[in-house]
């Protein structure tokens, strides 16, 4: 895909949204893209699908792009959706309402493309829209990135001279300060989580604030920009040389929003890296996504990651949710003479292999042509779906990706890649959340319990070939545990040259583009009679299809250990290679 000129990127954005046109309702306030449901009501579902394309259209319009049909759709839809007398009215708001999330994109439009979404409206239509958006000030919000939706609404209303709440604006901006940790990192409110919501939500919205409020609130604007510059130094480690991103945390179905932090940096006039580097990263990232089967037959984005997949979804994923990814196009607002449109793509800057990220609770290692994040399992227990798989694994890799569980009854259904999986009484138990953890200069340490009466202390030490795991286990029962490596594709519609080998205390899975070998390590102090009766053995798990986020059919190499009642230490070596 040619992504060089402004027109190239504009055409790319429009190619994603053009297929939606047949699915807008008569009054244009509803966009019906599928039949699956999220936990919120149908009115919010329609509003979400309607609003999220604005994350791409608004900067397109702000940068001079013309799309007359979409302009008419969105003016008519905004008018209908906020008119209580219209049959397509989006409905009343309640506490913690999904509608508040979708108000952010509409506010984005009012601020950056008023000539399309605001100026043409009649006075009555403007009043209806403002009254609807102001409902966000009348209800409580979750203490997380959601508070910034209210910030965007209030500064949008302020910009166009309409009613807003200075008190709520100040309260939420002060609340944002309580999220800040250091080195550019925030946590996502009281959840304590650090994931893509820090990049595509908190930094994204705070930089919009910095642009809009630079004259009214120069101190905060300067602070938010400085934090973004610092954050970029570590966040760039989440990508490999081909633009692939680490599949870590929730909302992975938002796909190419993973790189949108760098897009909004450009919008805000920030260059944490040279423009050619940022252009190269954004363009490569887009290409990796757009070559995958992420669209349905009508070219509508699907819920999933590398392919349609409801198993990995959160309870808040509705058919329109994936269009959050349109945030990647924030740079379309750049003027025609900006260097971004003429420079050639550059590769990533030279990065040190290891990057301990203490505020992110991650240790990231660049292996040349793939990148792995090693995690201690720190996250909120209030999950939205597959939370253990998205935060609790030992490793998250740009090329191997991760797998999600279908059940805890069988290993092949649990798909426990990069987990120490205990098999007890017919169930699979893995690390759900850690009790203690730390990120060191050499790796990751965590203390956790998969099952009552079993405690594990895991130390992970990455190096140039892979990583070594040391598990100190104290158990009140005898059981079996499988130390699992990365899932390796065994082919789907195309042959990938898959091969497997189980030999003694190791197992290897490989194909034409990658391999993973998992081996038990017995040090010189281990006595033969300690393991002779039940030594570790290599093991290959043929997992259920559609469990890995990138590859539809995989196998996971592992080592099977017999865990004795008492205390013991097991050491496993995982070598991973991308060819």
Enumerate the predicted regions with their spans.
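Short, conserved charged micro-motifs
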Residues: 67, 275, 479-481
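Aromatic-lined, polymer-binding surfaces characteristic
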Residues: 43-49, 55-60, 67, 71-263
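Low-complexity, glycine/alanine/valine/leucine- and proline-rich hydrophobic stretches
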Residues: 349-428
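Carbohydrate-active enzyme catalytic cores, enriched for enzymes
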Residues: 85-90, 129, 241-247, 252-383
């Amino acid at each position: 895909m040619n992504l060089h000129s402004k027109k190239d990127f504009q055409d790319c954005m429009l190619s994603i949204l053009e297929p939606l046109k047949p699915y807008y309702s008569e009054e244009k306030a509803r966009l019906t893209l599928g039949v699956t449901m999220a936990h919120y009501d149908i009115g919010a579902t329609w509003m979400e699908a309607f609003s999220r394309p604005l994350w791409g259209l608004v900067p397109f319009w702000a940068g001079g792009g013309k799309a007359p049909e979409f302009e008419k759709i969105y003016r008519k839809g905004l008018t209908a959706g906020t008119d209580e007398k219209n049959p397509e009215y989006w409905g009343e708001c309640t506490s913690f309402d999904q509608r508040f999330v979708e108000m952010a994109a509409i506010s984005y439009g009012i601020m950056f493309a008023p000539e399309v979404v605001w100026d043409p409206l009649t006075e009555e239509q403007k009043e209806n829209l403002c009254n609807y958006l102001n409902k966000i000030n009348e209800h409580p919000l979750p203490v997380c990135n959601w508070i910034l939706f209210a910030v965007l609404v209030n500064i949008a209303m302020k910009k166009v001279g309409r009613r807003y709440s200075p008190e709520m604006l100040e309260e939420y901006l002060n609340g944002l300060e309580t999220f800040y940790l250091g080195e550019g990192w925030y946590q996502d409110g009281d959840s304590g989580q650090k994931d893509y919501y820090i990049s595509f939500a908190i930094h994204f919205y705070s930089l919009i604030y910095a642009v809009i409020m630079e004259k009214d609130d120069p101190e905060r604007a300067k602070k938010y920009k400085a934090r973004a510059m610092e954050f970029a130094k570590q966040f760039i480690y989440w990508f490999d040389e081909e633009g692939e991103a680490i599949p870590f945390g929730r909302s992975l179905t938002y796909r190419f929003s993973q790189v949108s932090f760098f897009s909004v940096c450009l919008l805000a006039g920030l260059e944490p890296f040279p423009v050619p580097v940022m252009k190269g990263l954004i363009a490569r990232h887009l290409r990796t996504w757009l070559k995958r089967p992420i669209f349905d037959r009508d070219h509508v984005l699907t819920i999933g990651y590398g392919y349609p997949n409801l198993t990995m979804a959160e309870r808040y994923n509705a058919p329109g949710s994936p269009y959050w990814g349109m945030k990647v196009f924030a740079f379309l607002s750049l003027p025609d003479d900006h260097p971004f449109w003429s420079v050639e793509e550059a590769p990533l800057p030279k990065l040190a292999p290891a990057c301990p990220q203490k505020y992110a609770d991650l240790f990231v290692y660049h292996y040349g042509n793939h990148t792995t994040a090693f995690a201690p399992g720190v996250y909120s227990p209030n999950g939205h779906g597959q939370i253990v798989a998205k935060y609790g694994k030992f490793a998250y890799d740009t090329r191997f990706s991760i797998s999600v569980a279908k059940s805890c009854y069988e290993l092949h259904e649990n798909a426990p890649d990069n987990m120490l999986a205990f098999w007890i009484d017919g169930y699979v138990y893995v690390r759900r959340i850690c009790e203690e953890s730390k990120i060191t200069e050499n790796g990751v340490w965590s203390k956790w319990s998969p099952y009552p009466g079993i405690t594990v202390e895991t130390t992970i030490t990455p190096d140039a070939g892979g990583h070594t795991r040391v598990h100190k286990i104290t158990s009140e029962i005898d059981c079996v545990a499988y130390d699992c490596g990365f899932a390796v594709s065994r082919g789907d519609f195309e042959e990938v040259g898959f091969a497997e080998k189980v030999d003694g205390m190791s197992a290897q899975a490989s194909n034409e583009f990658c391999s993973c070998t998992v081996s038990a390590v017995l040090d010189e102090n281990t006595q033969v009679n300690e393991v002779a009766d039940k030594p570790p053995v290599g093991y290959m798990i043929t997992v259920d299809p559609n469990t890995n986020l990138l590859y539809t059919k995989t196998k996971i190499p592992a080592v099977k250990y017999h865990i004795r009642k008492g205390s013991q230490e097991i050491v496993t070596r995982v070598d991973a290679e991308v060819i």
